[in-house]
């Protein structure tokens, strides 16, 4: 005669199935959390899309945008596995991560050309010097320097409107360090956004607009924007593969990074994502219109992760004028 299980057995069995089901759900929902720079976002997002396809839904990768500074805040609190960064980690961020017990591997993933753009109807500022940019953006200019002819007497007597990243942005940090001479030192009366697409639309719809952001956003929107050649003291230079690689686009050429939480990298989904990132970086970086690094850099990045070589080769502040070969030398000697 068939013997039915008693209620106690049924309760235990149900509990076991719930646990097994929950375990399966956890496995099915393996998650890699990334946040940070809007500049680095297109690269990491492209990697994430291809990785998720390759994993056939076994891993979800979320890529948020809160600016490099905002991204490091989350990263150092242990809220994310990876941070996208358009500048090296700052001293205060190092201290925050250390206090929270968060160790990280620094990985340069590309070079970027921070691009100064104007509206296509602007036919006067085809080139601009670093000094002119400083006169336009420095804190002392707020409410006082508001017209083009105050920057250059040959330019029209019309009010300009400025567009730039917000104060949590690594791009903002780098630009102000390179142009004004001090990170975060800027006039405050400009349209700010962590979303570069907002800046693109602002300049594209304003004849007197001027803004700055990463090269990829310019290339993606070059039909409605015009890049301005920047004169850093050796003549005006436009951003391009050639001028970034030969180091002539200065001072607005810079390395960009991801930082990986070393504890997170113990999880298979995070380790596999980073491996996929480094193996496919050269192709995907170029696809989204950034400047890829030599293959050896990506190999070195993985070697550092595998050997748990944590920390940074930078000194805790934005550095201006770095060339590709200098970044390679530092990372290789870590």
Feature-to-residue mapping (PLM):
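N-terminal secretory signal peptides that target proteins for export/translocation
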Residues: 1-9
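Short, flexible coil/linker elements and helix-boundary hinge sites characteristic
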Residues: 3, 21-24, 309
